[in-house]
Amino acid sequence: FVMGKIMEDLNFAIEVFKETNRTKELYRVTWWTVQALKSRVGLFEGTYRKYHGLGDYEKYLNDCVSASNEIMTASGGYSLYQSGSQSYRNLFKSENAIDAEIILARDYNNDLSLVHKVQAFENSPTLGRTGVSKKLVNNGIQG
């Protein structure tokens, strides 16, 4: 019942966005974003129902396929980003999101204080692990 209502809401959003906002905007929810979410919800619910012996899984998997096809075949849609031999690397190292393949992005910007903490985690003295450093242990042993 709940997943049926979620799909109903997504279908409603698709209809609303179809009339108003079918342009590709990386940092806003658009018709494309709702189609992608419908695809993910359909895939998750369909496979969950299939492999847990629940009925009605084909409906959700078909919703996933139709939403995915819309994204890949609709005019002005998405495709795999290709920029030569380093396409995958270039897609993720770019300063700005690339709208050929990315449907929804977040713009990290120091000026607006929109940052992430990936490097803070990796560069911490314990590298994300709990415990004391070897240097501290050695200092305690010597004392």
Regions found by a protein language model. Give the residues of each.
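An aromatic- and glycine-enriched ligand-binding surface/loop that stacks and positions planar moieties
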Residues: 3, 12, 28-35, 40-143
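Conserved, well-structured interaction surfaces
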Residues: 1-4, 8-24
